[in-house]
């Protein structure tokens, strides 16, 4: 039996090399990403011969949801099975956004963030992260990354034009799979597709300085998030072995070269671990480290998981840490850990074996 190719892996110009004329590619994109077609036979504006040809050569179901769990805060974690049987997790984070209309009335509507995985497992080996425990199995293709987002939007009846933010903060190190992640960014941004602007896509990294520079040179327009978590190389290497290859100085040099929209900032994620990196002297060092960088610090309270030796700090300590940063002019927020009760929060995702 002929192996079908994942059509979600293709940019329009690539698909145009296989399908003529080009306006048919536009129609196919719209059927898949905007009309949420279930199969090629649904694509009624295409001639019958083309629908048959597509069905004989392509599929657009690279991920299959085998389980989902909803948190009391509304977050939903999805366990996806890939074609080869490996599994990844993704999270939908619904949030309420309020605006004032022309009449001065307060209007509330849903805003969505989708946290996607870029690899099955991860080789970075961060000591606080559950994903790293199983090592790296393989990279996801661009279509497997896009497939997570498409499935979640479709399943939750989120219209294609509804604004969503994408964060590459699920399983894996996105910049260790830069080729496919950057292609996913481009596919998601297509006007005939989901039309998710690169400015709404944030790529997080544990600090691969070389790849940060490569990403910057691509000029995709994406936002950058650095998983920092420590203010000196000794502690950071203990928490994140990747620091042996790319130390803090190398990361900061790469960040300074990274092109960022004047209205945006580079996000620095700082995981607060009780008694390890949450002291006020750490906050003071962080202020010095970020001097001259347009930065926003996202403080995250450590999320416990099976086998972890670390503890979650008190909210009181986190607020003191935040207050010191803010008093020195550093934009800083404490991230609300959504999905904590279903192990969907930062550092809790993993490749789960076939349990069902």
UniProtKB/Swiss-Prot annotation:
Its EC number is 2.1.1.192. [4Fe-4S] cluster binds at residues 122, 126, 129. Keywords: 4Fe-4S, Cytoplasm, Disulfide bond, Iron, Iron-sulfur, Metal-binding, Methyltransferase, rRNA processing, S-adenosyl-L-methionine, Transferase, tRNA processing. One of its GO terms (cellular component) is cytoplasm. It comes from Campylobacter jejuni subsp. jejuni serotype O:6 (strain 81116 / NCTC 11828). Its cofactor is [4Fe-4S] cluster. This is Dual-specificity RNA methyltransferase RlmN. It catalyses: adenosine(2503) in 23S rRNA + 2 reduced [2Fe-2S]-[ferredoxin] + 2 S-adenosyl-L-methionine = 2-methyladenosine(2503) in 23S rRNA + 5'-deoxyadenosine + L-methionine + 2 oxidized [2Fe-2S]-[ferredoxin] + S-adenosyl-L-homocysteine; adenosine(37) in tRNA + 2 reduced [2Fe-2S]-[ferredoxin] + 2 S-adenosyl-L-methionine = 2-methyladenosine(37) in tRNA + 5'-deoxyadenosine + L-methionine + 2 oxidized [2Fe-2S]-[ferredoxin] + S-adenosyl-L-homocysteine. Disulfide bonds join 115-346. Specifically methylates position 2 of adenine 2503 in 23S rRNA and position 2 of adenine 37 in tRNAs. m2A2503 modification seems to play a crucial role in the proofreading step occurring at the peptidyl transferase center and thus would serve to optimize ribosomal fidelity. One of its GO terms (biological process) is tRNA methylation. GO terms for molecular function: 4 iron, 4 sulfur cluster binding; metal ion binding; rRNA (adenine(2503)-C2-)-methyltransferase activity; rRNA binding; tRNA (adenine(37)-C2)-methyltransferase activity; tRNA binding. Pfam families: Radical_SAM, RlmN_N. The lineage of its organism: Bacteria, Pseudomonadati, Campylobacterota, Epsilonproteobacteria, Campylobacterales. The active site is at residues 89, 346. It is found in: Cytoplasm. It comes from the Bacteria. Binds 1 [4Fe-4S] cluster. The cluster is coordinated with 3 cysteines and an exchangeable S-adenosyl-L-methionine. SUPFAM superfamilies: Radical SAM enzymes. S-adenosyl-L-methionine binds at residues 172-173, 204, 227-229, 303. Belongs to the radical SAM superfamily. RlmN family.
């Amino acid at each position: 039996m002929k192996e079908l190719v994942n059509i979600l892996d293709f940019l329009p110009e690539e698909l145009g090399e296989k399908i003529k004329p080009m306006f048919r590619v536009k129609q196919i994109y719209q059927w898949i990403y905007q009309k949420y077609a279930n199969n090629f036979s649904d694509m009624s504006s295409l001639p019958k011969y083309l629908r048959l040809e597509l069905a004989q050569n392509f599929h657009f179901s690279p991920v299959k949801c085998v389980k989902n769990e909803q948190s009391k805060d509304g977050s939903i974690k999805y366990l996806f099975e890939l074609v080869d049987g490996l599994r990844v997790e993704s999270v939908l984070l619904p949030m309420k956004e309020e605006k004032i209309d022309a009449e001065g009335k307060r209007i509330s509507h849903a805003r969505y963030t989708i946290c996607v995985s870029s690899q099955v497992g991860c080789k970075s080996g961060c000591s606080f992260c559950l994903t790293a425990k199983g090592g790296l199995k393989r990279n996801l293709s661009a279509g497997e990354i896009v497939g997570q987002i498409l499935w979640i939007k479709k399943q939750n009846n989120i219209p294609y034009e509804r604004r969503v933010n994408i964060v590459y903060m699920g399983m894996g190190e996105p910049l260790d799979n830069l080729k496919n992640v950057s292609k996913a960014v481009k596919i998601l941004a297509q006007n005939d597709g989901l039309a998710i602007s690169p400015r709404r896509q944030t790529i997080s990294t544990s600090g691969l300085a070389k790849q940060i520079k490569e990403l910057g040179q691509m000029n995709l327009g994406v936002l950058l998030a650095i998983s920092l978590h420590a203010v000196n190389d000794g502690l950071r290497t203990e928490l994140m072995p990747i620091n042996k290859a790319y130390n803090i100085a190398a990361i900061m040099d790469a960040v300074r070269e990274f092109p960022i929209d004047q209205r945006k900032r580079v996000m620095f994620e700082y995981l607060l671990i009780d008694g390890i990196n949450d002291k006020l002297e750490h906050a003071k060092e962080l202020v010095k480290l970020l001097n001259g960088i347009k930065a926003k610090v996202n403080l995250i309270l450590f999320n416990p998981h099976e086998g972890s030796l670390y503890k979650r700090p008190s909210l009181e300590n986190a607020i003191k840490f935040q207050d010191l940063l803010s008093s020195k002019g550093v934009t800083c927020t404490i991230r609300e850990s959504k999905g904590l009760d279903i192990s969907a929060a930062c550092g809790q995702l993993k490749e789960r074996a076939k349990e069902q």
